[in-house]
Amino acid sequence: MKAARFVLRSAGSLNGAGLVPREVEHFSRYSPSPLSMKQLLDFGSENACERTSFAFLRQELPVRLANILKEIDILPTQLVNTSSVQLVKSWYIQSLMDLVEFHEKSPDDQKALSDFVDTLIKVRNRHHNVVPTMAQGIIEYKDACTVDPVTNQNLQYFLDRFYMNRISTRMLMNQHILIFSDSQTGNPSHIGSIDPNCDVVAVVQDAFECSRMLCDQYYLSSPELKLTQVNGKFPDQPIHIVYVPSHLHHMLFELFKNAMRATVEHQENQPSLTPIEVIVVLGKEDLTIKISDRGGGVPLRIIDRLFSYTYSTAPTPVMDNSRNAPLAGFGYGLPISRLYAKYFQGDLNLYSLSGYGTDAIIYLKALSSESIEKLPVFNKSAFKHYQMSSEADDWCIPSREPKNLAKEVAM
């Protein structure tokens, strides 16, 4: 901590030459400290100590920001130099500097605690458009440069880590703001954004109705919901887990939206639409949600592309300077939904029967003690990943025009 104070005292403003990199360099030497859902609950329990949360976050948030800033710096130069990526980078550096100022403040100073909440709100608002702005930077880069397969793979690797980092920092900031802010705007039954008794089926039904409303507006019809729940831990009891309802709703809404669109378009000439079937199962270790549609499915070669940040079936949106930047069209729905699932050690997978339909499966941890943040860390392994060079494929690639062996034998 003394080293951090020395760096602070030696730093002036953001405009000082070479000062910002020293801040980033200092905090990037630390690894992020992942928290479990149980620890996040303890931070917000009745005996929650604002000073403890303050002391943790003023160190942890700069560490997480600095780690991902180091990864931004080793991206292709043409990408880093785009106006969009430069803007995102400036937001992260400014936020890091804002937070580091509190290293000189005492946790016993009530004004410092109050100012810290205000700063977290300011940082959260500043980062509001990070996702579409970074997406725009990728588009600018791809429009200007030819992107080889290895670079494309590295972009996927980076964006997974960048957006997971963003999910984690927003989670920590939201928890502190909701619990310790003077204006109590959260759900009284929640601890911050966490519901200790999350009714999974209720979230499923709400996400379905939200998706259905959009489907009705666009297609003037929508499929029904057929829901089954199986509680393998406590038979005949409702299914509840400790979770973040907004994260679960985000995943479900995206999957229902895709399932409804596929169903309506595939069955447009049918007298009625096949219902979307959902089964929710609580086991000893996992909570599993399977969403099945009869929307015609997708070919196997397309499945991996659906989780690519550079693939979308919607037209590419145009960015403007408003705060309401679009997300549809960037192709980010499924990959970011998968990140939400993976954030607390879960997963999201698609299994498709081309010509029939698709199963989407969400896996979540059933126990809060096992729901631990999955966080990227900038280290030698991460750096090495970006240094991979393009090598020849060690599997035969089928030719689009196979040789005519009969003709060759005749010759």
Curated annotation (Swiss-Prot):
Point out the signal peptide segment: none
Alphabetical list of InterPro entries matching this protein: AK/P_DHK_N_sf, BCDHK/PDK_N, BCKD/PDK, HATPase_C_sf, His_kinase_dom
- GO cellular component terms? mitochondrial matrix; mitochondrion
Alphabetized, the UniProt keywords read: ATP-binding, Kinase, Mitochondrion, Nucleotide-binding, Transferase, Transit peptide
- Sequence ranges assigned to domain Histidine kinase in this UniProt record: 138-368
Matching entries from SMART domains are given as: HATPase_c
Tissue spec. comment: Ubiquitous; highest levels of expression in heart and skeletal muscle.
As its record notes, the protein acts as a catalyst of: L-seryl-[pyruvate dehydrogenase E1 alpha subunit] + ATP = O-phospho-L-seryl-[pyruvate dehydrogenase E1 alpha subunit] + ADP + H(+)
The entry's ATP-binding residues are: 254-261, 293, 312-313, 329-334
In the Enzyme Commission scheme, what number(s) does this protein have?
2.7.11.2
| Keyword flag ATP-binding | yes
The primary site where this protein sits is mitochondrion
Location(s) in or outside the cell: Mitochondrion matrix
Query: What molecular function does GO assign, one term?
Result: protein kinase activity
The stated induction of this gene product is: Up-regulated by prolonged fasting, in glucose-deprived cells and in response to a high-fat diet. Down-regulated by insulin. Up-regulated by PPARD.
Enzyme class name? transferase
Query: Which biological process annotations from GO are given for this protein?
Result: cellular response to fatty acid; cellular response to starvation; glucose homeostasis; insulin receptor signaling pathway; negative regulation of anoikis; reactive oxygen species metabolic process; regulation of acetyl-CoA biosynthetic process from pyruvate; regulation of bone resorption
Asked whether the keyword ATP-binding is assigned, the reply is: yes
Site: Interaction with the other subunit in the homodimer. Where?
A: 157, 161, 395
Q: Which cysteines bridge via disulfide bonds? A: none
Question: Which superkingdom does the taxonomy of this entry point to?
Answer: Eukaryota
Biological role: Kinase that plays a key role in regulation of glucose and fatty acid metabolism and homeostasis via phosphorylation of the pyruvate dehydrogenase subunits PDHA1 and PDHA2. This inhibits pyruvate dehydrogenase activity, and thereby regulates metabolite flux through the tricarboxylic acid cycle, down-regulates aerobic respiration and inhibits the formation of acetyl-coenzyme A from pyruvate. Inhibition of pyruvate dehydrogenase decreases glucose utilization and increases fat metabolism in response to prolonged fasting and starvation.
What's this protein's family per the entry?
A: Belongs to the PDK/BCKDK protein kinase family.
Subunit description: Homodimer. Interacts with the pyruvate dehydrogenase complex subunit DLAT, and is part of the multimeric pyruvate dehydrogenase complex that contains multiple copies of pyruvate dehydrogenase (E1), dihydrolipoamide acetyltransferase (DLAT, E2) and lipoamide dehydrogenase (DLD, E3).
UniProt-recorded name of the protein: [Pyruvate dehydrogenase (acetyl-transferring)] kinase isozyme 4, mitochondrial
Species of origin: Homo sapiens (Human)
